[in-house]
Design a protein with these regions (language model features):
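Domain-level signature for soluble enzymes in the chorismate/prephenate branch of the shikimate pathway
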Residues: 2-106
Length: 106
């Protein structure tokens, strides 16, 4: 009797080096999520404060300074500054959206 394709396949032996890398990535991903959650807890408080004090939801000057600062940090860390800027702009847009919701302007 001939073995079909499903019969001849075996489960590959896990590569311990790759498994170690993946475990590190999983830990870093978890840390990123917790850090983002903390960041959003703080920006939520900022949004509430801005709503109470009638400050605008966004601060373009602050945002541009943050982007410039993080681009420099990215360069120093050998991380693509373009990627870092896109990532931060995405976060800023979400924060502004939350601030607008806190003020009832969106």
């Amino acid at each position: 009797m001939l073995a079909g394709p499903a019969m001849s396949q075996t489960t590959p032996t896990p590569d311990p080096v790759l498994a170690g890398y993946r475990a590190s990535i999983d830990n870093i991903d978890a840390a990123l999520i917790h850090i983002l959650a903390e960041r959003f807890r703080i920006t939520k408080a900022v949004g509430a404060y801005k709503a109470q004090t009638n400050l605008p939801p966004s601060d373009p000057g602050r945002e541009e300074r943050q982007i410039a600062r993080l681009r420099k940090l990215a360069e120093d860390a050998n991380l693509d500054p373009e990627f870092s800027e896109k990532f931060l702009r995405f976060i800023i847009e979400e924060v502004i959206r939350h601030h607008e919701q806190a003020q009832g302007t969106r």
